[in-house]
């Protein structure tokens, strides 16, 4: 039998569809009956490299190269389906400009900040890194060192980085790019429930009667979940979908109630819904009385800008504990939200009254099971934590939580923003399993697990992502290592903060990346990095599902994984180089040892021999280090959460499964947390138990609407919102190197309302400048297509390295989560 490429693609699609439908697969669609070339493929499972959905894909390898991928029919997440990015996964590793040797800026054979990138060996790279790190340590101590990591790190990479920075170099100046996307979600969970990550799971997609999207374009950003939601909507006539956004996008195609609101007024809409529930007598009084407390939050907390910024000076609560709150009762809460009437909120938000009432009734009706989804529209918000708290309020007031179909659900954007950034604790203030560096008991637990002297881990939280850029610019952060992200393209206010910091002569910047990204080109040293299935690893997705994969192919010669780089670099430092004598005196047996010895080889990380790796499996990192390092890192990390409601299964089990949702207790995963009968950590007889709080009660917060940091005025008369598109992922450093995806969406355009274009004498395709108080960027006008902004707002995606929209954005952050607001700033547009 012969089969051409087109038939093969069609056959895969048939197989996936048949699997979902539960019907038999035609012979032409079976992987077992193919052409002779295709039967040479070796297939294995892996978690997708892109978004936080956590699809499983089958990866086809031939002649040492990934040549095909398709949706994994055994996956409970995607059930054989794949989005367009996942379909082209096989091409992301084979861009023509893949890096294979370290590159150092040099002039006449010596390092020079203004020199040209010159190939050097790995030994030379580590030598200059060690020299620069030691110089910074001797001059200004551990606070002069920093690292910016990623929600794309594997679990093991993130854990290795946390140990190296917080235990080895004794600095908390490590933060992930998840600070830009998930920090507000973390803050919301911790404030309301005292514990992080969603209580629901993707099974809610088949159980809910209604879905509400808050600042989430699932149709493009989470297309596989959108497929499941669409199937539920179209197969069950009673199911309804509401979509709220500041502009119309593809998710509105399915909306029964689509609402365009004025930026920042989602806060007022959320309070109106709470008021409606109370005024119509639909509060679940039994649930509320048994399982919740009420608190009034601090207000007017500023915008996370530099302290000297006029907006920070103006904030009445500037300088106080911005996340503090005081107890109130239900009546006081009801009075607080009573001012958010349908009339006033409609006027403020621009949403018609009947649409607001329809939305509120959906939540209020006790017969309707509601799942709320949100992503960056909520989180990238100067009041992002508040927005998260306020949507929880609605679910708590009605008791619509932690049962099938009733979930407030924060969706993640990166493959392991949950599994690595949040669960491992790669944030500047966190440790694994929701522990924090400020808590002495938590530090003691970490020091015990890591077998460190008491006092090794510093108590002061480190510099968060935005503050890292400011400290680089100010010359206070001098040795800086960036891994697995493209922050020079992703960070807000590039012109004024990010770029000046990278090019500050006082600083030495290292960037680890497979490709010469914008960030890499701003660095002093570039390290070539292995990608995805060129290494063994694990990711954790948005529904608490941890997944693993084996190494399937060799990286290009010279490219090394992020984990290998971190652990190998640790060999360059003896304990005496980085720890004070009084600390070493508490554990004299470490004297003379390297950080590699203390943190990895001689720790519990190093106790799993190479013989535990299956003989037929590649594992370059472990064979370099002499022990099964991925298993060792995972098992040590997992010890933080076992018995503390973050339980993970034994490492080897994950290789046999399509992931497991934690907590995994007695071998069984957990679908819905905080509900007795589903969550093993709930106390018997509790019904619901929000055990993250000492009294088992979740908190309903009274928090007001407050305006955005920057709004349009006479000169800068337009709102700018940024985001993504279906075809590209984040900065496009992978997807723009896939020819098919690049051709489908080659350039980032600015989407405008036709009336705004006409007013400025602009037409579709015109070259224009977007200008803010901080910078400008050129692009072309689009007045048609998938994104339809209202009058007064424009939308521009940020995937295009040739059109850096973050030159114009404002680096305002949520003062609680320190997450950047990329959705709201003021600009003007002029023709070029």
Swiss-Prot record:
It is found in: Periplasm. SUPFAM superfamilies: ADC-like, Formate dehydrogenase/DMSO reductase, domains 1-3. GO terms for biological process: cellular respiration; Mo-molybdopterin cofactor biosynthetic process; nitrate assimilation. Keywords: 4Fe-4S, Electron transport, Iron, Iron-sulfur, Metal-binding, Molybdenum, Nitrate assimilation, Oxidoreductase, Periplasm, Signal, Transport. GO terms for molecular function: 4 iron, 4 sulfur cluster binding; electron transfer activity; iron ion binding; molybdenum ion binding; molybdopterin cofactor binding; nitrate reductase (cytochrome) activity. CDD domains: MopB_CT_Nitrate-R-NapA-like, MopB_Nitrate-R-NapA-like. Mo-bis(molybdopterin guanine dinucleotide) binds at residues 85, 152, 177, 181, 214-221, 245-249, 264-266, 376, 380, 486, 512-513, 535, 562, 722-731, 806, 823. It comes from the Bacteria. Pfam families: Molybdop_Fe4S4, Molybdopterin, Molydop_binding. Its main location: periplasm. Predicted to be exported by the Tat system. The position of the signal peptide cleavage has not been experimentally proven. Residues 1-29 form the signal peptide. Substrate binds at residue 798. [4Fe-4S] cluster binds at residues 48, 51, 55, 83. It catalyses: 2 Fe(II)-[cytochrome] + nitrate + 2 H(+) = 2 Fe(III)-[cytochrome] + nitrite + H2O. Its cofactor is [4Fe-4S] cluster; Mo-bis(molybdopterin guanine dinucleotide). Binds 1 [4Fe-4S] cluster. InterPro entries: Asp_de-COase-like_dom_sf (IPR009010), CT_Nitrate-R-NapA-like (IPR041957), MoPterin_dinucl-bd_dom (IPR006657), Mopterin_OxRdtase (IPR006656), Mopterin_OxRdtase_4Fe-4S_dom (IPR006963), MopterinOxRdtase_cofactor_BS (IPR027467), Periplasm_NO3_reductase_lsu (IPR010051), Prok_molybdopt-oxidoreductase (IPR050123). Gene3D superfamilies: 2.40.40.20, 3.30.200.210, 3.40.50.740, Dimethylsulfoxide Reductase, domain 2. Catalytic subunit of the periplasmic nitrate reductase complex NapAB. Receives electrons from NapB and catalyzes the reduction of nitrate to nitrite. Component of the periplasmic nitrate reductase NapAB complex composed of NapA and NapB. This is Periplasmic nitrate reductase.
């Amino acid at each position: 039998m012969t089969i051409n490429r087109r038939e093969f693609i069609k056959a895969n699609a048939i197989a996936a569809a048949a699997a979902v439908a539960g019907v038999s697969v035609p012979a032409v669609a079976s992987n077992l009956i193919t052409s002779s070339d295709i039967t040479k493929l070796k297939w294995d499972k892996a978690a997708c490299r892109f978004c936080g959905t956590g699809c499983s894909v089958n990866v086809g390898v031939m002649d040492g190269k990934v040549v095909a991928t398709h949706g994994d029919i055994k996956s409970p997440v995607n059930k054989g389906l794949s989005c367009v990015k996942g379909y082209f996964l096989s091409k992301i590793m084979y861009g023509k400009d893949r890096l294979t040797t370290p590159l150092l800026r040099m002039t006449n054979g010596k390092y020079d900040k203004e020199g040209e990138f010159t190939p050097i060996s790995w030994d030379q790279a580590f030598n200059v890194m060690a020299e620069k790190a030691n110089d910074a340590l001797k001059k200004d101590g551990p606070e002069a060192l920093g690292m910016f990591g990623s929600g794309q790190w594997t679990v093991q990479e993130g854990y290795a980085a946390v140990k190296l920075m917080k235990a080895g170099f004794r600095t908390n100046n490590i933060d992930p790019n998840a600070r830009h996307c998930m920090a507000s979600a973390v803050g919301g969970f911790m404030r309301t429930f005292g514990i992080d990550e969603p209580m629901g799971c993707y099974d809610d997609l088949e159980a809910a009667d209604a879905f509400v999207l808050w600042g989430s374009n699932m149709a493009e950003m989470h297309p596989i979940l959108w497929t499941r939601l669409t199937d539920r909507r179209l197969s069950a006539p009673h199911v309804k979908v509401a979509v709220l956004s500041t502009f119309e996008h593809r998710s509105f195609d399915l909306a029964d109630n689509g609402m365009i609101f004025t930026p920042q007024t989602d806060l007022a809409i959320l309070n109106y819904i709470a008021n409606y529930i109370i005024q119509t007598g639909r509060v679940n009084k039994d649930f509320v009385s048994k399982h919740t407390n009420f608190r009034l939050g601090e207000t007017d907390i500023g915008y996370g800008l530099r302290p000297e910024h006029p907006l920070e000076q103006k904030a009445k609560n500037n300088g106080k504990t911005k996340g503090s709150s005081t107890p109130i009762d239900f009546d006081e809460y009801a009075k607080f939200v009573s001012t958010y009437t349908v009339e006033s909120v409609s006027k403020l938000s621009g949403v018609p009254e009947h649409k607001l009432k329809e939305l509120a009734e959906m939540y209020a009706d006790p017969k309707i099971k509601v799942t709320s989804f949100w992503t960056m529209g909520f989180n990238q918000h100067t009041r992002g934590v508040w927005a998260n708290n306020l949507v929880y309020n609605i679910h708590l007031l009605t008791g619509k939580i932690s049962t099938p179909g009733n979930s407030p659900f924060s969706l993640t954007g990166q493959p392991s923003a949950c599994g690595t950034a949040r669960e491992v604790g790669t944030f500047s203030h966190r440790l694994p399993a929701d522990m924090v560096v400020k808590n002495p008991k938590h530090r003691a637990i970490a020091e015990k697990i890591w077998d460190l002297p008491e006092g090794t881990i510093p108590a002061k939280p480190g510099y968060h992502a935005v503050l890292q850029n400011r400290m680089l610019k100010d010359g206070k952060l001098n040795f800086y290592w960036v891994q697995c992200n493209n922050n020079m393209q992703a960070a807000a206010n590039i012109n004024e903060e990010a770029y000046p910091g990278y090019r500050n002569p006082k600083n030495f910047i290292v960037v680890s990346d497979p490709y010469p990204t914008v960030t890499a080109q701003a660095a002093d040293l570039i390290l070539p990095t292995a990608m995805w299935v060129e290494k063994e690893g694990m990711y954790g997705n948005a529904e608490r599902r941890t997944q693993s994969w084996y190494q399937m192919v060799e990286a290009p010669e010279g490219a090394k994984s992020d984990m290998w780089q971190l652990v190998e670099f640790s060999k360059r430092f003896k304990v005496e180089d980085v720890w004070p004598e009084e600390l070493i005196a508490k554990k004299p047996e470490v004297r003379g040892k390297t950080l590699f010895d203390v943190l990895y080889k001689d720790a519990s990380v190093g106790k799993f021999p190479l013989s535990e790796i299956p003989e037929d499996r590649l594992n370059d990192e472990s064979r370099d280090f002499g022990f099964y390092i991925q298993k060792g890192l995972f098992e040590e990390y997992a010890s933080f959460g076992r018995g503390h409601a973050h339980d993970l299964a034994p490492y080897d089990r994950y290789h046999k499964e399509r992931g497991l949702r934690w907590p995994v207790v007695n071998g069984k995963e957990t679908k819905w947390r905080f509900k007795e009968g589903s969550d093993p950590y709930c106390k018997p007889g509790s019904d619901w138990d929000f055990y993250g709080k000492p009294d088992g009660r979740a908190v309903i917060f009274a928090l007001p609407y407050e305006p955005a940091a920057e709004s349009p005025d006479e000169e800068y008369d337009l709102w700018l919102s940024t985001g993504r598109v279906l075809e590209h992922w984040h900065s496009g450093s992978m997807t723009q190197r896939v020819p098919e995806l690049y051709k489908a969406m080659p350039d980032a355009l600015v989407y405008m309302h036709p009336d705004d274009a006409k007013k400025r004498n602009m037409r579709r395709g015109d070259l224009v400048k977007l200008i803010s108080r901080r910078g400008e960027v050129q692009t072309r006008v689009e007045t048609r297509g998938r994104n339809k902004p209202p009058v007064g707002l424009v939308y521009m995606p940020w995937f295009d390295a040739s059109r850096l929209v973050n030159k114009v954005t404002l680096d305002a952050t949520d003062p609680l989560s320190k997450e950047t607001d990329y959705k709201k700033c003021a600009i003007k547009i002029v023709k070029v």
